[in-house]
């Protein structure tokens, strides 16, 4: 694995907060926007296990995702495209570790403990998910129109 490219991807991901996750199910493709945190190059998030994307991950773990800031100048386009597999984190120690990453990144998650009952209950029902990328493409038009670098991840 190209360590320099991996580091640039990690730095970019750390500067962003929303990914668009694409899943597949009986009704076709589905995309959803999610807050995320990183564990190296793995993306972590929480979701209702009964949400459409969560159910689709349980049925078929193959996913794709993009992370990109909004911009109006094509030369400023930067982002990543990922494909790999997603799964629900079931090991208690791993779940606690990943929740810690998310709560460290997003203050509103820490504040839910003192928030309204409905929000606390909804958060308590969430499941932790992890995307293990197989490949990541870093896009950076500041390096030239359509500039892309691919990082293959060894399983």
Name the predicted role of every residue range:
Residues 13, 56-57, 102:
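A generic structural signal for nonpolar/aromatic side chains embedded in well-ordered alpha-helices
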Residues 48-51, 64-69, 105-117:
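Short acidic (Asp/Glu) patches
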Residues 15-16, 59-60, 134:
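Structured helix-beta-strand junction loops
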Residues 1-18:
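Extreme N-terminal tail/first-helix region
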Residues 51-53, 72, 144-146:
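Short, surface-exposed beta-strand-loop junctions and turns on beta-sheet-rich folds
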Residues 16-49, 55, 64-69, 77-81:
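Short beta-strand segments
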Residues 78-155:
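Charged, gly/pro-rich active-site loop segments
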């Amino acid at each position: 694995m190209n360590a320099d490219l991996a580091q640039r991807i990690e730095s970019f991901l750390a500067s962003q907060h929303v990914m668009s996750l694409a899943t597949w199910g009986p009704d076709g493709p589905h995309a959803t926007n999610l807050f995320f945190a990183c564990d190296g190059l793995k993306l972590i998030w929480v979701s209702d296990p009964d949400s459409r994307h969560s159910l689709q991950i349980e049925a078929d773990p193959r996913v794709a995702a993009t992370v990109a800031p909004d911009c109006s100048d094509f030369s400023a386009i930067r982002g990543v495209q990922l494909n790999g597999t997603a799964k629900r984190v079931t090991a208690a120690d791993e779940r606690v570790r990943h929740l810690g990453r998310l709560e460290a990144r997003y203050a509103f998650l820490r504040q839910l403990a003192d928030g309204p009952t409905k929000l606390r209950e909804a958060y308590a029902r969430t499941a932790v998910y992890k995307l293990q990328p197989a490949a990541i493409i870093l896009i950076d038009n500041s390096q030239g129109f359509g500039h892309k670098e691919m990082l293959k991840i060894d399983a």
